[in-house]
Amino acid sequence: MDQLAIERSTTKKVTLRLIPFLFLCFTISILDRVNIGFAALKMNHDLGFSNAIFGLGAGIFFLGYFLLEVPGSAMMVKVGPRKWISRIMVTWAILAVLVAFVKTPMEFYIARFFLGVAEASFYPCMVAYLSGFYQTKHHAKAIAGFMVAIPGANALGAPLSTFLLSVNWLSLAGWQWLFILEAIPSFILGIVCFFYLDDQIKDIKWLNKDEKKWLIDVTTKEELEKQQVKHYTFLQALKDRDVLILSAGYFCWMVGYYGINMFLPTISKGLSEKTSISTQSMGWILGLMYICAMVTMILVGNHSDKKNERRLHVAVCLAISAIAMIISSYIANTSIILSFVFLTIALCGTFGAYAPFWAIPPSFLTGAAAGGAIALINSIGNLGGFFGPYIVGYIKDTTGSFNMSMIFLGVSLIIGSCIVVFLVKQSGKVQSNNFETKLKKSS
């Protein structure tokens, strides 16, 4: 069998083995993360929470996430992906159920904080793990393959969550059942994960001898090529210029991303009330919006791989999202339909940037360094998940509308776009030139 045939068969088997399962795990994690936005439609009224209280509680999840993100990534390297990812899923499932029984703002804050602690490092561990089984040229497409779970989970979660809000079983409100029922799959998949995943390529039993040898050879060769340019240790990666700049860009992006996502059900409910659309119908509309975002994510990821370019793909997506978000704030009172259209475009932009963005760190880092860098970028970036929802809620309580909140989120996305396009050097075709320059200087 020639090398090209082996490459194709191996890549296909890896994709069929890993992508569907990781997609499912990530879908459940996103459901558990975003269901708070839908729960707010009834929970805030039942518990007497203001928008600011809800925004703080929704965002404080990311403080816990931030504190354990980098240490969690280091633990994965020490104990292995199989055990660590399994532990994450089981513990966050248990804590997600506890959120259903909060009564006061303080209980809400504490439960959300420790939920963030439990889930910390899940995403960077997934990215680092998946990247280790693919050639660099396939990273964006592979990452997009499981990252479509983000809009996919929202598309599924919107109608499912709005349905669960209408139930009242065993004297528990619908929003409580929303947390309980959506945590059960996390617990089950966490156990399955322990038996299904392989820690390293050498542990794989589902590839034949030639395929296994080819995969070990190409991934080892690419890791050595990266190390010849500059060998990064775990700690050195955390101090790298591009890693820190990517963290700053991701922070601005996540301010906009979580600011809109946590409050989108509430914003949409306000718009739908002007047209007498029911809560469940609104759930289906939101589901369609997220399906559009999912398609965009796949298309952008494929185009990024085809052009071997990351930076501009990220920047353009964020800029489009920012413009659409700002426009939607100006037309919300004049055209409900157009407002939903521009909100959809904004979602497509924020989701479309994911695959090319996360293909950048593995393109110049490897092994523990890649895991640590991804964890740092994700943890610092996700602090935006704390500030975004809280500031949106505060502005809404202060001004009485979401218009200024949307403008604030749009500005944050524009700043993130500028940081990525003007400051980040490691990107697609640019990267090889940087590597060649460093090699010449070191020789």
Show where each model-derived region lies.
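Extracytoplasmic
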Residues: 17-51, 157-161, 260-265, 388
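Cytoplasmic helix-loop-helix junction between adjacent transmembrane helices
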Residues: 111-148
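Extracytoplasmic gate region of multi-pass secondary transporters
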Residues: 36-37, 235-298, 354, 358, ...
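C-terminal transmembrane helical hairpin of 12-TM major facilitator-type secondary transporters
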Residues: 310-360
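Helix-breaking motifs and short loop linkers at transmembrane-helix boundaries and internal kinks
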Residues: 48, 80, 101-107, 118, ...
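Glycine-rich segments within core transmembrane alpha-helices of 12-TM secondary carriers
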Residues: 141-162, 185-186, 378-388
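Conserved MFS/SLC helix-loop-helix module at the cytosolic interface between two early adjacent transmembrane helices
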Residues: 67-106
